[in-house]
């Protein structure tokens, strides 16, 4: 399920999925920012540049994204909360954006399933980037979460095979 809201040029996209995996497994995938290049559409490179010395979770990361010949690298501040099962990333400080925030959350649902929610709020500083985003904007959250679902299936299968 995906929703869109628009306030001026701020684009807000949300997507949710029910998944049959443990919350801790899903959180470990979402908090592993180094793997984003494997499942986030248009993400060509993802690299954690700072970790919290106490928790080991990322606090800063660089992402390189590309679309239609444009390629940009930007850094994000990352907050991983294993108790609340949330991962927040904010790149609003980067010159490319007026705002870019993502919020992943995980919560128990019914029948042994877990709900994963993704919210992406962004506004480009450049009109050109803003116009380009219209081509992919409406599907961005759905495509990211669909990529995440596929990544979870692959990782879960690998873990299951390693346990044998």
UniProtKB/Swiss-Prot annotation:
CDD domains for the chain: COQ10p_like
Localization of this protein: Mitochondrion inner membrane
Keyword list, A-Z: Membrane, Mitochondrion, Mitochondrion inner membrane, Ubiquinone
Gene Ontology biological-process annotations: cellular respiration; ubiquinone metabolic process
InterPro entries assigned to the protein according to its UniProt record, in alphabetical order: COQ10-like, COQ10_START, START-like_dom_sf
Gene3D superfamilies named among the record's database cross-references: 3.30.530.20
Pfam family, one: Polyketide_cyc
Topology with respect to the bilayer: Peripheral membrane protein
GO molecular function annotation: molecular carrier activity; ubiquinone binding
Gene Ontology cellular component list: mitochondrial inner membrane; mitochondrion
Family statement: Belongs to the COQ10 family.
Biological function: Required for the function of coenzyme Q in the respiratory chain. May serve as a chaperone or may be involved in the transport of Q6 from its site of synthesis to the catalytic sites of the respiratory complexes.
Subunit structure: Interacts with coenzyme Q.
Protein name according to UniProt: Coenzyme Q-binding protein coq10, mitochondrial
